[in-house]
Amino acid sequence: MNKRVGKLLVMILIVGMFGFFGYSLVTKGKHTDVGDKAYNFELPNLDGSKTKLTDYKGEVVILNYFASWCAPCKEEFPELAAFQKDYGKKYPLIMINRGETMDRINKVTKKNQEGMTYLFDYNAKISKLYNVTGQPETFVIDKQGIIREHYNGPVTEMQLYNWAKKYDK
């Protein structure tokens, strides 16, 4: 019985390795990374109108992926709100939600508006292009449209400010 289990585990491992390798080949080059040109997108916002990344051409832009059920995202909201209040006019902060309904997000944003732009990536198409694997995730895009930072986890107001200032050239 132990030989059978051992052979089965080896087969599963081999199939898994081939599956991972195949997936890597298929998805290679299909997402952006630090140092790449940011993928331009057009997504709906809270009022239903569309916002494009190119609307912010020539500005340092911060993208933050979040979810309403995400505890670290909720902890991060006061820091994001403080950044938006203190630096949002100079460095736009765009909040992107993937896969949740507008009604659900409206409940969250009522407490955390602070003039932030909230966008909806319903089918996670843009999230996949940006290689978003969780939330919160933050991207800093420089004035030339290049992704300069990709950070997984909650951020602070000062982290955001320091990144934005660093790429404000």
Enumerate the language-model features and the residues they cover.
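N-terminal targeting signals for export/organelle localization
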Residues: 1-40
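Short loop/turn microsegments at loop-to-beta-strand junctions
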Residues: 38-39, 61, 135-136, 151
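A short beta-strand-turn-helix
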Residues: 40-61
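Conserved redox-active cysteine motifs that mediate thiol-disulfide chemistry
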Residues: 57, 65-82
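Conserved hydrophobic packing residues within short motifs/helices of P-loop NTPase cores
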Residues: 61-63, 94-96
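Short, internal strand/loop/helix patches
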Residues: 94, 106-144
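Thiol-/selenol-based redox modules, centered on thioredoxin-like
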Residues: 140-169
